[in-house]
Design a protein with these regions (language model features):
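C-terminal, non-catalytic "cap/extension" segments appended to globular domains
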Residues: 29-61, 68, 250-252, 380-382, ...
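N-terminal helix-rich structural modules
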Residues: 30-231, 236
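Short pre-active-site segment immediately N-terminal to the catalytic Zn-binding motif
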Residues: 483-502
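Active-site-proximal, well-structured secondary-structure segments within enzyme catalytic domains
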Residues: 165, 169-170, 201, 208, ...
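Bacterial signal peptide processing site
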Residues: 23-25
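C-terminal motif of bacterial Sec signal peptides marking the signal peptidase cleavage site
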Residues: 18-21
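Bacterial N-terminal signal peptides that target proteins for export
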Residues: 1-8
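Short His/Asp/Glu-rich catalytic/ion-coordination signatures at enzyme active sites or charged loops
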Residues: 46-61, 110-129, 152-194, 254-292, ...
């Protein structure tokens, strides 16, 4: 997942409702400066590429830096908006690109840490700042004088003698200001400000509750015997987690961010499997940290906001600037796949039920049984035991000999450790990226291990964005939640985690390879349904024979994974794809249905709404619930993927088509890798996404590659 923190857009004032307000008083600005001279966030870091100096940044620095940043930024915006000179590209658009340096710097660090290394102090600041940041965004986006200048330039954009990238930037600004409400009446602007403030407050509260829920719903297990099926390493980790949580002598199973839980594939105790699954699936429905009420209200207020802006619903509003363009296009894409996906899923369910019956189970398949018995089916069908593969996927080897190796083979880049650079947690490692000619390109932070204070999932984000205009090079981070082994033991990753490591590096290189002039167009600043293309494309290299042979080696002997075992692993790649695809589609369509509500629709009962949405689309298979239920659907509600979770599959169509094309061009080689790097990853949003894709591929994508990738084509 690409995590687009608001800091990336602040300098360009291209945010659409998640920034905030501050005083416009010059005296206030001067007073804040006088008081905060010892705050390291007030000046650009002197470390390479302005990498944040985490050794001196403290929690108490953030709030004053954010408030001063907003004050300075707003003064800069007023200067631009009230400039008596006629609007030009330089005195308006370029000036906006250069504005908000302090706010960008402070917020990029702050919002990265609230996601990956949060604590009560940071969460308190986050709650206080949310409505202020929303107001600040509105103060910019709804400024009539500022929009008049942008509108004037937009109308004359093709007559100004500008570069194609500069014209593209004007178009991006204009569209985002329109979609933020810049051309609304004064009365409508008052209403949209109120809705933006409420949305900001609710999404922040949603995130905070999800973080608290992660700790609250962890399952305490009394005896080791109940954990039969887990490895000794996993049991030791569960014991250590329990001790850290104050449950000495017991075991703790932490719940991940998805409905399905990895531990369910190994646990033999059916009653415990049910406890764990229900803890996951029922989170947020009730209790002090319930999120159901937030889901209903967020869907409602987003519909109200869309109506103010002249759209039928939030989904229509959100998709207008995307590649998909309309909700109907998304429904059509999924609808065309439902028959194949359901057919695969029903066959998988029948195979699993047969395995339950064969092994003496006298019960019908339930959601908490799927993964446990699916693993048995996998072993029988492919003679593949997940534990037999495990010793060949040691974390460091996967990262260095898999992910980093692929980057060098395809794109000519290398990453070297930078232990001298400060990090925000001992588990984080810093690297410097070098191009084939030895020139330095970027700083990369690797934050792969789960810990308290980190939200669930995996994502990429930026501390510093690339820009020729400002002379900045990228500083990016990849974040995951891999379970770290106890001290002194190697950390192993599942094959799913292997592909996620490749996926997030796809986002990372999208940021680090960026070569554009303007920061607002850099790297991952593309549409939601294009941003997942580079990352999904990168996933497929994890299974490339040459790449696998380089990293899939036994952690003790260094011997490569036996060819027989490797072939079993590769052949099993399409196993359970009905389940995997259906649970994703279910979540994506529930997201789309929530955000297709009309503005006059009443508040919805979450469970009833979900059930009706799944039934409507023919995905109501009880043993296969959505990957995320609404109450913990971070992408769609507190995150930036509302009415956009479909984007993963839309992007996968591009990725599968592109990867198939690459194989016709020799596969893993520098020539095709550099073509892809230059036409896709270096250009950011300086070129329209489909135009960039056709520059690489020579044509628009088809769905054939996707169906082959997921092993679904044979069922059509």
């Amino acid at each position: 997942m690409h995590k687009s923190f608001i800091a990336i857009a602040i300098g360009a004032t291209l945010v659409t409702g998640t920034l905030a307000g501050c005083s416009t008083s010059d005296t206030k600005v001067q007073n804040v400066i006088a008081i905060q001279t010892d705050n390291p966030l007030l000046q650009a870091s002197t470390l390479q590429y302005q990498t944040p100096d985490f050794s001196v940044i403290k929690d108490e620095h953030f709030k004053p830096a954010l408030e001063q940043g907003m004050a300075e930024h707003y003064q800069e915006i007023l200067t631009i908006a009230n400039n008596p000179a006629a609007p030009t590209f330089d005195n308006t658009i370029v000036a906006m690109e250069k504005s908000g340096a302090l706010l960008t710097r402070a917020s990029s660090v702050f919002y990265n840490l609230t996601g990956s290394n949060s604590n009560p102090a940071l969460r308190k600041i986050q709650g206080e700042m949310a409505p202020k940041m929303a107001a600040h965004s509105d103060n910019i986006n709804l400024n009539p004088a500022l929009f008049a200048r942008i509108d004037s330039l937009y109308n004359e954009r093709n007559n100004l003698g500008l570069t194609p990238e500069a014209v593209r930037l004007i178009e991006v600004y204009h569209q985002r200001f329109i979609m933020a409400g810049a051309n609304l009446t004064d009365e409508q602007k008052v209403k949209i400000r109120a809705l933006n403030e409420e949305q900001s407050t609710l999404t922040n509260e949603f995130s905070q509750r999800l973080l608290r829920l992660t700790k609250e719903i962890a399952v305490v297990v009394d005896s080791k015997s109940e954990l039969a099926g887990l490895t000794e390493s996993d049991i030791t980790a569960a014991s250590n987690d329990a001790k850290a949580a104050g449950h000495d002598g017991k075991y703790l199973i932490n719940i991940t961010n998805t409905t399905r839980q990895p531990v369910l594939a190994s646990l033999e105790n059916r009653e415990l499997r049910q406890r764990i699954w229900e803890a996951s699936a029922n989170r947020g429905l009730s209790g002090e940290n319930e999120t159901a009420s937030l889901v209903s209200r967020l869907a409602q207020l987003r519909a109200e906001r869309a109506a103010l802006l002249g759209y039928e619903n939030w989904a229509t509003y959100r998709l207008a600037p995307q590649m998909a363009k309309t909700p109907e296009a998304v429904y059509s894409m999924f609808g065309s796949m439902v028959p194949a996906v359901v057919a695969n899923t029903e066959k998988e369910a029948a195979d699993i039920q047969a395995m339950i019956d064969k092994t003496g189970g006298k019960f019908e398949l339930a959601p908490w049984d799927w993964e446990f018995y699916a693993e048995k089916v996998r072993q029988e069908k492919y003679a593949l035991d997940a534990n037999s593969v495990r010793p060949y996927f040691e974390f460091n080897r996967v990262l260095e000999d898999g992910v980093f190796y692929t980057l060098k083979e395809l794109y000519g880049v290398t990453l070297k450790p930078r232990p001298d650079l400060p990090v925000y947690h001992p588990d984080v490692k810093a690297y410097e990226m070098f191009d084939a000619d030895g020139s330095s390109m970027a700083i990369f932070y690797a934050d792969y291990f789960a810990r308290e204070g980190k939200r669930g999932g995996a994502w990429m984000s930026s501390f510093v964005g690339q820009s020729h205009l400002e002379g900045t090079k990228p500083v990016v981070v990849n974040v995951m939640n891999i379970k770290k082994a106890p001290e002194g033991q190697p950390t192993f990753v599942s094959y799913n985690e292997v592909t996620t490591m490749f996926h997030e590096m796809g986002h990372g290189t999208h940021g680090m390879f960026s070569k554009v002039t303007y920061p607002s167009l850099a790297g991952t600043s593309v549409s939601r349904d294009f941003v997942e293309f580079p990352s999904t494309f990168e996933e497929d290299w994890a299974a490339h024979p040459k790449v696998l042979a380089n990293y899939a080696k036994h952690y003790e002997t260094g011997q490569p994974i036996p060819d027989e075992l490797l072939q079993k692993l590769l052949k099993s790649g399409s196993f359970n794809q009905g389940f995997d695809t259906l649970e994703y589609m279910a979540a994506a369509l529930v997201d789309m249905e929530w955000h297709s509500l009309s503005p006059d629709a009443p508040l919805q009962d979450v469970a009833t709404f979900e059930a009706n949405a799944l039934k409507k689309h023919g995905l109501n298979i009880s043993a296969v619930p959505p990957r995320y239920k609404s109450t913990y659907f971070a992408h769609a509600f507190p995150g930036g993927y509302s009415a956009s979770y479909y984007a993963y599959m839309w992007s996968e169509i591009l990725a599968a088509d592109a990867f198939a094309y690459v194989q016709t061009q020799g596969g893993l080689n520098r020539d095709i890798g550099m073509k892809y790097r230059k036409t896709i990853r270096e250009v950011g949003n300086s070129i329209a996404p489909m135009e960039a894709y056709k520059n690489f591929r020579g044509q628009e994508p088809t769905t054939e590659g996707l169906l082959n990738r997921r092993g679904l084509k044979q069922t059509l």
